[in-house]
Amino acid sequence: RPNGYKLLCSWLVAKKLNLASSFTFFKSEYRNNKQSEYIASAWDNRYIFNLSGTYNFPRHWSFGMKVSCIGGAPYTPYDEEKSRLVTAWNAQGRPYYDYSKYNTGRLPAFGQLDIRVDKTFYLKRCMLGFYIDLQNVTKSTFKQPDIYMSTGVIENPSDPLPEQRYKMKYIEQKSGTLMPTLGITFEY
């Protein structure tokens, strides 16, 4: 049962300032049958916000900025107890999900700020432009579910095989890189 709302706004001020924004609020759930409870779908981030603007300066210079925010996506946590069992891990070589908690976890929201500066030259029959674009200026981190991994060390080697458990560790999954780009545009 997906549903949502979207608001769009756009402003143009005296050919110098151009602003556009959008806010989307939504909820996306489903259920396996009429008796089961609703479950968040994989793309149920709940909201998306974008604000972008460009200001045109004299002599064909322009400055642009974009702010983007998105709510955290749902995820399914691991079944840590089952994943630790030596026989279970060796059978699959990766962790098991706890499907009784399907999509009950939620990642943190993510926001990003991008900026761009352009300089344009108008020649007789063409246009030449140069720009520098900086994505994720604030170095905001985008988080994914951590990876649950076996260290290969058995914590209780003297126990019977069905009771033996691996020592486990989590590997953090996040990124937050500042991405600079230099560019040239040419039109004729």
Predicted regions and their residues:
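Gram-negative outer-membrane beta-barrel transporters
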Residues: 1-74
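Membrane-embedded beta-strands of outer-membrane beta-barrel proteins
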Residues: 5-7, 51, 115-117, 182-184
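Extracellular loop and loop/strand-boundary signature of outer-membrane beta-barrel proteins
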Residues: 6, 34-40, 100-104, 167-172
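A broad, low-specificity signal for short, low-complexity segments enriched in glycine/proline
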Residues: 12, 23-24, 79, 91-95
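C-terminal beta-signal and adjacent terminal beta-strands/loops
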Residues: 19, 69-92, 108-112, 119-188
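Flexible, solvent-exposed coil segments and beta strand-coil junctions
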Residues: 26-34, 90-99, 158-165
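Polar/charged side chains located within well-ordered beta-strands of beta-rich proteins
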Residues: 61, 118-119
